[in-house]
Design a protein with these regions (language model features):
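Conserved "HGTGT" condensation-loop signature of ketosynthase/thiolase-family condensing enzymes
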Residues: 1-77, 98-103
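Conserved catalytic cysteine-centered active-site region
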Residues: 31-50, 83-125
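Residues that line or immediately flank small-molecule/substrate-binding pockets and catalytic motifs
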Residues: 80
């Protein structure tokens, strides 16, 4: 058995706001954000997106890009600043969404031997 991180993935929403526009609305000098922090645009979720759908998109991309078998994945770590539920890891929602998409290729409950961990903290997530 091989241990360690085999792959990582992320999802960036397609909607964004130019930092210059944000700075002007907030009465901040645009150069402070553009040159000082290196920011040029800020992505934000569409009405049907949240932390769980971002995670599901990233997980599905990871599985497809690395040709992974979900039945062989034993743990999924999710890093986020935005938990959906104080009792249930956001990664469980993502895993359930991806499991539904992968059911025809890998069978029902293809993640049944996988556990999930959320890391909800701005600097870690």
């Amino acid at each position: 058995m091989i241990y360690g991180i085999e792959a990582a993935s992320f999802h960036v929403p397609s909607l964004y706001l130019e930092i210059k526009d944000l700075a002007e609305k907030r009465n901040i000098e645009p150069a402070k954000l553009e040159k000082g922090l290196g920011l040029h645009k800020m992505a934000f979720p569409d009405v049907h997106e949240d932390a769980a759908t971002f995670a599901a998109e990233a997980l599905l991309k990871l599985i497809r890009d690395y040709n992974l078998n979900p039945k062989e994945i034993s743990r999924i770590y999710l890093g986020t600043e935005s938990a959906l539920d104080a009792a249930k890891p956001t990664a469980t929602y993502a895993m359930q969404m991806v499991e539904t998409v992968l059911e025809k290729d890998f069978g029902a409950r293809c993640f049944k031997n996988c556990d999930v961990v959320d890391m909800t903290f701005a600097c870690v997530g």
